[in-house]
């Protein structure tokens, strides 16, 4: 399909640099889905609480999305002179086109819709920072992404029309702002919690997969995951957070033997039809930013 135009402005970014960041985004998606065992989520062992998707769907989806990540970076660069709050409007058509390719690659299965939003924002932020010759760090990337999303929660969640979306309903009922709120706040769960936790575990010499699984537990314990709440209600969300925190309090995931606790947690999530997809999306961002 034809790609939406980015801007009439030109970018000075090298294609090799753009492709390098796009490759990191693809690797981040693959790293997350291949990580096993993950409670309630699709991984190399099973399909978690999902009956409509499998590991191969995520592999195809990630490849389809990778082709669009350079467009987000390019738009971020080309729109560098725009006010940041005007950028999101220009990103939407790119995101919708990317989403269309994802659905075509998976025969209609929603594998990475959340990641298109979050990785798209971060890639656009990287493009803007590079174009402006500003420092590209996890903190500056997330702060720039937040500036794109200023007012997003108010505009899209705080509405009183009769046809509420799932996100609007969860916001009104439980006060959960989901992916929009996390983006508008500059991804504090990643910047202040998951990323430093993951990097500390790596510095301590922990196996990277075990470190990432432990970081997933941290996200599950702290994230007001709208995916979980939509499937299991407030009770399901509180149960998941409590169980994840209990595992962390008991020492977390430090050895291969600890994976037995995750396998049991996975079985319980499947029985409850709970899948922490929002936390999985944040784990993708955590790994992505850890490489920068």
Swiss-Prot record:
<dbReference type="GO" id="GO:0051191">
    <property type="term" value="P:prosthetic group biosynthetic process"/>
</dbReference>
<protein>
    <recommendedName>
        <fullName>2-(5''-triphosphoribosyl)-3'-dephosphocoenzyme-A synthase</fullName>
        <ecNumber>2.4.2.52</ecNumber>
    </recommendedName>
</protein>
<dbReference type="GO" id="GO:0046917">
    <property type="term" value="F:triphosphoribosyl-dephospho-CoA synthase activity"/>
</dbReference>
<keyword id="KW-0547">Nucleotide-binding</keyword>
<dbReference type="InterPro" id="IPR002736">
    <property type="entry name" value="CitG"/>
</dbReference>
<comment type="similarity">
    <text>Belongs to the CitG/MdcB family.</text>
</comment>
<keyword id="KW-0808">Transferase</keyword>
<dbReference type="GO" id="GO:0005524">
    <property type="term" value="F:ATP binding"/>
</dbReference>
<keyword id="KW-0067">ATP-binding</keyword>
<dbReference type="Pfam" id="PF01874">
    <property type="entry name" value="CitG"/>
</dbReference>
<comment type="function">
    <text>Catalyzes the formation of 2-(5''-triphosphoribosyl)-3'-dephosphocoenzyme-A, the precursor of the prosthetic group of the holo-acyl carrier protein (gamma chain) of citrate lyase, from ATP and dephospho-CoA.</text>
</comment>
<dbReference type="InterPro" id="IPR017551">
    <property type="entry name" value="TriPribosyl-deP-CoA_syn_CitG"/>
</dbReference>
């Amino acid at each position: 399909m034809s790609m939406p135009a980015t801007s009439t402005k030109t970018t000075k970014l090298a294609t090799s640099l753009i492709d390098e960041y796009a490759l990191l985004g693809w690797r981040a998606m693959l790293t997350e889905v291949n990580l096993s065992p993950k409670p309630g989520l699709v991984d190399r062992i099973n399909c978690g609480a999902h009956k409509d998707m499998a590991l191969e769907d995520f592999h195809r989806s990630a490849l389809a999305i990778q082709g669009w990540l350079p467009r987000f970076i390019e738009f971020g660069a080309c729109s560098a002179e725009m006010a940041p709050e005007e950028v999101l409007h220009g990103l939407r058509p790119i995101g919708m086109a990317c989403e269309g390719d994802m659905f075509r690659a998976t025969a209609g299965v929603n594998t990475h819709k959340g990641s298109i939003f979050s990785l798209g924002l971060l890639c656009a932020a990287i493009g803007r920072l590079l174009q402006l010759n500003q420092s590209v760090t996890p903190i500056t990337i997330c702060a720039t992404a937040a500036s794109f999303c200023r007012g997003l929660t108010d505009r899209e969640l705080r509405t009183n029309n009769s046809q509420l979306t799932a996100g609007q309903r969860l916001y009104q009922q439980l006060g959960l702002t989901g992916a929009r709120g996390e983006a508008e706040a500059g991804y504090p769960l990643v910047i202040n919690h998951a990323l430093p936790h993951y990097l500390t575990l790596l510095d301590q010499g922990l196996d990277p997969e075990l470190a990432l699984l432990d970081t997933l537990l941290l996200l599950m314990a702290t994230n007001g995951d709208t995916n979980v709440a939509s499937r299991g209600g407030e009770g399901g969300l509180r149960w998941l957070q409590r169980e994840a925190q209990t595992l962390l309090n008991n020492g977390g995931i430090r050895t291969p033997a600890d994976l037995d606790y995750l396998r049991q947690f996975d079985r319980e999530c499947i029985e409850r039809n709970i899948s922490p997809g929002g936390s999985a999306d944040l784990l993708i961002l955590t790994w992505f930013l850890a490489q920068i």
